[in-house]
Each structure stands twice: as C-alpha cells, then as structure tokens.
Regions:
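Mixed-charge interfacial surface used for oligomerization/domain docking
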Residues: 10-17, 22-23, 92, 97-101, ...
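N-terminal glycine-rich anion-binding loop in soluble enzyme alpha/beta folds
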Residues: 3-67
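Residues that form generic nucleotide/phosphate-binding pockets
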Residues: 50, 71, 146, 150
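Short glycine-rich or small-residue beta-strand-to-loop segments that form or flank ligand, phosphate
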Residues: 79-86, 113-116, 130
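Secondary-structure boundary/capping motif
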Residues: 39, 60, 91-92, 123
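A general structural motif
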Residues: 1, 77-79, 109
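Active-site cofactor/cluster-binding pocket
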Residues: 63-79, 84-104
Length: 205
C-alpha cells in the first residue's frame, strides 16, 4: 500500500486527485487582506477575479509541517511519497522535510520520502504522474531512486502571458516590463536558483 501526498502546486484537479487517491496539502493565498485556502472550498472564479483586479501584492503561505504531519500520521502504515513545488520557490519542501523527520522519530519503521520536484505547475504534475506509474509494480526501494532520477533529468519550460502579477509582487520593475510587451518564455532547470532566474530575466530586458 502507498500514499502520495502533494502540495497544490500540482495541476491535477480536485476530482482527479480523489480518483487517483492523492492527498493535497493546500497553499494559502492572501489578497487584499482576505485569505484563501487552495482546497475544495476555493471559489476559483471569485479568486481569479480578485487576483486580476487587485493593485496590491498577493501573498502566499506554504503548508506548515503540521499540515503534512497530520496526513502522514493517518497513513503511517503505507509507503509515503510527498511531492512539493521547487524548494527554490517556496518553503513547502522544508515544511515537508520537518514533518518527515518528526514522523521518523514517532514511527521507527515508517517508509517515507520527500521529493523536491524542482518545478511547479505542469512540471510538478508530470512528476506526480510518473510516480503513479512507478508505484504500480516497483517497491519503495526501487521507486525512490527512479523518481529522483526523473526529477534530476527534467527541464520545465513555461510561458507568462502577462507580467502584471510579477510587477505587483515586486519581482520585476514596471519600467523593465514596458520595454518587453510580449509573452515571455522561461526555462526552469534542475538546480535553478532564484538569483540566476533574475539574472536571466535582466538579460532579456
């Protein structure tokens, strides 16, 4: 028996994760002082509308170690795989690792592995789907190196249709975005660091 746990950087719908037996651990998003939890109760239409209209920075909070630990404890008798958004983009991976450490102290024989997908969104989803394929006929000891190899040999590319939210959150300067009024393609590679991301961005602009 196994259990796959993922933060909500994964793009699988709530219906799909239920069908596949995956457990989501949600991010929290704050817009104009109102906090939204990325779970089954999130009104996506309302959320996207407010995100588009606000002129203020949008704040996010990653899952806490306790959020992960609750699900781990409920499934401690299973092979556990936890997948997170890139550790370079969020503290979700660190939270999961803290929960893993606490679980190992509480459950001596637990089989648990935290996977830094080194990606987000579609790249994260691809790793989840690959993991689902691996667990069908491989043992925990075989799955772990196989999925890590998959992650380390992957590259994610993505397109930004708008830089509006990057500007609002202080990621890029408005003056820079005005000079480059096109869709921007980014390449997100293994071991990419935030500093390097900005250096590439500055070269583009």
């Amino acid at each position: 028996m196994y259990k796959i746990i993922s933060d909500t950087s994964c793009d699988l719908s709530k219906e799909e994760v239920k069908e596949l037996g995956i457990e989501y651990v949600p991010f929290k998003i704050s817009i104009d002082g109102v906090e939204y939890e990325d779970d089954d109760n999130l009104n996506m239409e309302e959320y996207l509308d407010k995100m588009e209209k606000t002129e203020n920075a949008i704040k996010t909070a990653c899952p806490s170690p306790y959020d992960y630990l609750k699900i781990i404890e409920e499934n401690s008798d299973k092979d556990l795989y936890i997948l997170t958004i890139s550790s370079k983009l969020s503290g979700s991976y660190n939270s999961a690792k803290i929960a893993e450490q606490e679980a190992r102290e509480k459950f001596k024989d637990i089989k648990i592995h935290v996977i830094d997908t080194k990606a987000a969104s579609a790249g994260h989803t691809r790793v989840v789907l690959k993991l689902l394929d691996l667990v069908k006929d491989k043992s925990f000891e075989e799955v772990v190196p196989a999925i890590e190899s998959e992650v380390n040999n992957s590259t994610t590319m993505f397109v930004l249709e708008s830089m509006k939210n990057l500007i609002k959150n202080g990621r890029i300067k408005k003056s820079a975005s005005d000079k480059f009024n096109k869709e921007v393609l980014y390449r997100f590679k293994d071991k990419t660091k935030t500093k390097e991301f900005y250096e590439i961005q500055e070269q583009i602009f």
